[in-house]
Amino acid sequence: MFSNKDLRKLIIPLVIEQLLAVTIGMVDTVMVSSCGEAAVSGISLVDSINFLLITLFSSLATGGAVIASQYIGRGDHKSASLAAKQLFYASLALSAVLGVIAVFFRKPVLNMVFGSIEADVMAHAQIYFLLSAISYPFLAVYNAGAALFRSMGDSRTTMLISILMNTINIVGNAILIYGFQMAAAGAATASLVSRAVGAIIITVLLLNPRRIIFYDKLHKPEIHLSMLKSILQIGVPNGLENSIFQIGKILVASIVSGFGTISITANAVAGNLASLQVIPGMALGMAMITVVGQCIGAKDYEAVKKYTKKLMLITYGVVWAMTLLMLLFSKQILSFYSLSEETTTMTMEVFIVHGICAVIVWPLAFALPNALRAANDVRFTMIVSLLSMWIFRIGFSYILAIYFNMGILGTWIAMCIDWFCRGACFVIRFARGKWKNISFIDN
């Protein structure tokens, strides 16, 4: 079904797109770092909440992408387009509701999650949260559109849009942060504008009826409950899984926030570097949805095994390469941040721990489960993620970071323990082949 050329055309733009997506967060942090560590800390704390909400949009988009991919594999393009339209409406509705809630309750949420943090950190966090919330609908619509393009095997279009969005973001940061000294507000405004532009462009492109999947008469709402149910069968468990994952990260961030501004900043910078480190793996995981989803639609289970193994080998190769490269140039990379010596040392310490664990188990913990999701085996991945997160990541974070007084290093070691547990579970599940029994959704 997919030649090596087809896989390259799908994967390479995805890697570039994911690199650019993570760059937005890194550029924000690097540029705001010139305004002081309080601004960096404020953005970091809000982003832990943002990621929780944004992951819901991504999960819904994944549900739509899986259904669309399966219909494409079956050759039913009309149903694929119908699924796309339902995904658009659902994404817009969910993001609008969450955006309104975040705008009006941002201060109580910040106080509830992070408790008493320094006043200047809270000031930056509040304005960043407000502007981020306004951008939620744009981001949700863009995520939905990007997922649909990937379902068609067209990741080049989303890559080009991502390049434009990042250009807008970087230029906006330069003007608002350096020119107008807007700090966190400037970073959030630039991101808001870039997301709005991306959402508009990708929606317009999907109105073209010549595409395999397109938005048919978007101005005339039509809700097909059976189709929406199929999307939600994937999106809801995936959303719960990812939400639990982000809630766990927020709880860990609340532990880190108790160690002071230096620890918060080190955790934020190390988090940015860690995201960059696994970008190729994230891209391969996204490609897994498209490839396996279409194989599932065609009911070709041998192809599922073949392409999953092939993509996993590629994932391991690129994660190893990226990790070695970043460790070799870690000092040069950290020099872009305006960090104190103590913060730099702490950042480097946890980044090394992450690198060692990433090359061993990250692909099994985060790329392989996408093959299960593409086969609709989302309940299993949700249950494993829920148990692993709460038992290992959160439980061991309290034990290592607080009881054994290891600080943020303890939270990162706990994260690695979580990875090993979930990775083992996903390997066993895929090998046993139970996903074949729930692999196709028929309306």
Where in the sequence are the language-model features?
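N-terminal transmembrane alpha-helices
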Residues: 2-30, 34-35, 51-63, 67, ...
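Short alpha-helical transmembrane segments in multi-pass integral membrane proteins
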Residues: 1-14, 68-135, 179-236, 292-358, ...
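Transmembrane helical elements of multi-pass membrane transporters/channels
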Residues: 9-25, 131, 194-198, 202, ...
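Residue-level hotspots within the lipid-embedded alpha helices of multi-pass solute transporters
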Residues: 18-19, 55, 95, 99, ...
